[in-house]
């Protein structure tokens, strides 16, 4: 199967999305989605999944550096369940330092990070998905 994966950098009002190539080797930036409520976000993700032959999502999991959960982790836990309930395969990927890595990449390319939050989310989602793919993925 050549089903693709979508990586998600989850936020309260927007998410950064990346997509795998059909062979699940490389993560490619896709888009940032702004949303007003979870129902709207889930609908948009379903549409994108259908358009791109996606059956699986990889969601960044925001643990603290000491491996403890925080408020955002609890929101991602709920989001994980909602995506699963839509009959997608959903995986969690440690996202610690993904935003910092995204900022570093942007600075190395002389891209300003200050007012470029969407670009940071997009690169962070790409880092999250690439980290997952690098671990080796079983064809679902």
Predicted regions and their residues:
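Phosphate- and other anionic-substrate recognition elements at nucleic-acid/protein interfaces
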Residues: 2-5, 13-140
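Conserved catalytic-loop position in the HRD/HxD motif
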Residues: 9
């Amino acid at each position: 199967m050549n089903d693709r994966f979508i990586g998600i950098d989850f936020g309260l009002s927007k998410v950064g999305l990346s997509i795998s190539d059909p062979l699940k080797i490389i993560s490619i930036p896709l888009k940032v989605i702004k949303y007003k409520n979870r129902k709207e976000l889930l609908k948009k993700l379903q549409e994108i999944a259908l358009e791109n032959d996606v059956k699986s999502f990889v969601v960044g999991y925001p643990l603290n550096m000491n491996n403890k959960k925080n408020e955002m982790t609890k929101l991602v836990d709920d989001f994980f369940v909602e995506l699963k309930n839509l009959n997608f395969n959903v995986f969690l990927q440690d996202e610690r330092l993904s935003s910092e890595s995204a900022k570093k990449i942007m600075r190395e390319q002389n891209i300003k990070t200050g007012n470029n939050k969407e670009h940071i989310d997009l690169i962070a989602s790409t880092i999250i998905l690439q980290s997952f793919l690098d671990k080796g993925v079983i064809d679902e």
